[in-house]
Amino acid sequence: VSLRVLTVLPPRESYAEGHAGAIALLVSRLAQPGDRITGKAITDVPLPGGSFVPLEISGWPLPQRLKYGMACLSEARDFKPDLIEVHNRPDLALFLSRFAPVRLILHNDPGSMRGAKTPAQRQRLAERLLVCGVSRWVVERFSDRCGPLSVAIQPNCITLEDIPEVRPRRQTVLFAGRVVADKGVDAFVRAWATIRSCYPGWTATLMGADRFGPDSPETPFLARLRPEAEKAGVFMTGYQPHARILDAMAEAAIVVVPSRWSEPFGMTALEAMACGAAVIVSPVGALPDVVGSAALLASPDAPGALEGALCHLMDQAALRSELGQKGRERAAMFGLEQARAQLLELRQQAVSFSRGSAVP
């Protein structure tokens, strides 16, 4: 049975081509033809998945959170969905569950989210609606200090058809992502500065900016990093569209994901594996689960760890090739076909769950 589904994006997420973050890209990838996607207004072309309708946010001097919630309710009353899917906003999901069946998809640690900070709040959410996390790590964080809960895992996915064909590998080490301290980008620059003189035939590239989109601001962190990167011989490209990043991953011999932040999934690592690069990730959050045995682990701040892993790979072409093949096989487990089949199943579960839960 085809369900009418309204998908609600987080307030800061843009559903526009060239400006979309990870959540919007995933929503577009998985969207069914009849899905309606809603969120903040955009001025550029919307992403192709589903049908995007901007929220009409009230001009009244009310808290932004309240105005966003009321706009979502108005959109739900207009569309009359069988199910509302809310991404990363537990408080909004609980509010909307009073009016329609809701499925909450968590992309980050819920312990820092409004409406899910305490075990009691998370318990209440799990009793009222179907909660899904993008990784085992997220589900464990949601269940922490709670009684028995029913929480599903809905892993992120990739469109394998969008992955560029295998190309000759350049002797390049690539970092791709947000250029912020949490992502360990300064550790990458430090590591490269330490070892570059031993590898004159190799180059290092840093793709990304503080946030997604071409109008990303210059930040104090970036201002400090630029001269360090220049001195280390790391080429900084600034923000690049998603397709360009995939092209770079398909050419780079090595991709590093040196996050300090406990990555709730690790999309960059998954995409790098799909592109056939040899990958190095931090042993934090969901990253070890996502890569399995198809990547090397190295802590960004452990003395010599990242440098050692890079040298290990740059010294051994056979190991790079082996990890590249393992990575492609691992990434195939996260393909779109499997993800869409699971999505339809979870949607039906969410509607059935809502019918069986008591609404006060």
Where do the model's predicted regions map?
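Carbohydrate-associated surface elements
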Residues: W137, C157
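Short His-centered aromatic/hydrophobic patch
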Residues: V86-D91, L106
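Nucleotide-activated donor-binding/catalytic signature segment of Leloir-type glycosyltransferases, i.e.
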Residues: E218-A243
